[in-house]
UniProtKB/Swiss-Prot annotation:
<keyword id="KW-0408">Iron</keyword>
<dbReference type="GO" id="GO:0048038">
    <property type="term" value="F:quinone binding"/>
</dbReference>
<dbReference type="GO" id="GO:0008137">
    <property type="term" value="F:NADH dehydrogenase (ubiquinone) activity"/>
</dbReference>
<keyword id="KW-0813">Transport</keyword>
<keyword id="KW-1278">Translocase</keyword>
<dbReference type="GO" id="GO:0050136">
    <property type="term" value="F:NADH:ubiquinone reductase (non-electrogenic) activity"/>
</dbReference>
<feature type="binding site">
    <location>
        <position position="147"/>
    </location>
    <ligand>
        <name>[4Fe-4S] cluster</name>
    </ligand>
</feature>
<keyword id="KW-0004">4Fe-4S</keyword>
<dbReference type="GO" id="GO:0005886">
    <property type="term" value="C:plasma membrane"/>
</dbReference>
<dbReference type="Pfam" id="PF01058">
    <property type="entry name" value="Oxidored_q6"/>
</dbReference>
<keyword id="KW-0830">Ubiquinone</keyword>
<dbReference type="GO" id="GO:0005506">
    <property type="term" value="F:iron ion binding"/>
</dbReference>
<keyword id="KW-0997">Cell inner membrane</keyword>
<dbReference type="GO" id="GO:0009060">
    <property type="term" value="P:aerobic respiration"/>
</dbReference>
<keyword id="KW-0520">NAD</keyword>
<comment type="similarity">
    <text>Belongs to the complex I 20 kDa subunit family.</text>
</comment>
<keyword id="KW-1003">Cell membrane</keyword>
Amino acid sequence: MENQQHQVLEQELWQGYKDRGFVVTKFSDLVDSVVRWSRSGSLWPMTFGLACCAVEMMHTAASRYDLDRYGVMFRASPRQADVMIVAGTLTNKMAPALRRVYDQMAEPKYVISMGSCANGGGYYHYSYSVVRGCDRIVPVDIYVPGCPPTAEALLYGILCLQQKIIRGNPGVRGA
């Protein structure tokens, strides 16, 4: 379906070029696509490591996986970050802090939920003190499954977020 839409658009652009020698497009669409492309290539995640998933998150920044080559640079301050990676078990006491940090991030902001505990409570799902998924506190864009998920899985989640931003899906806020 998406490929057919792409082919139709390509034919319309080529026909316009053949008829007039140039292509006319809506300037706002062009600017939006350039902005989405640039945002996808310069993600600055803020780590919110709560448990063992945070160790795997650290591996992605090391030389073997090297997130820098994708334009991803970890930030310590929420005011400098546009992506929050929630990694690990979120307790009821930590939930207000998570929300406060999320609110301090500038728009557009995205959230990656990493690991079974962040996705749905994981091993501690039935504990009275555990939030059963960080999506109950903040809106989540990408879920990375696993206990703990591998560094490759997080890398794939980041690449999926980049593609979501480029496509400009309505589910992605601010894109």
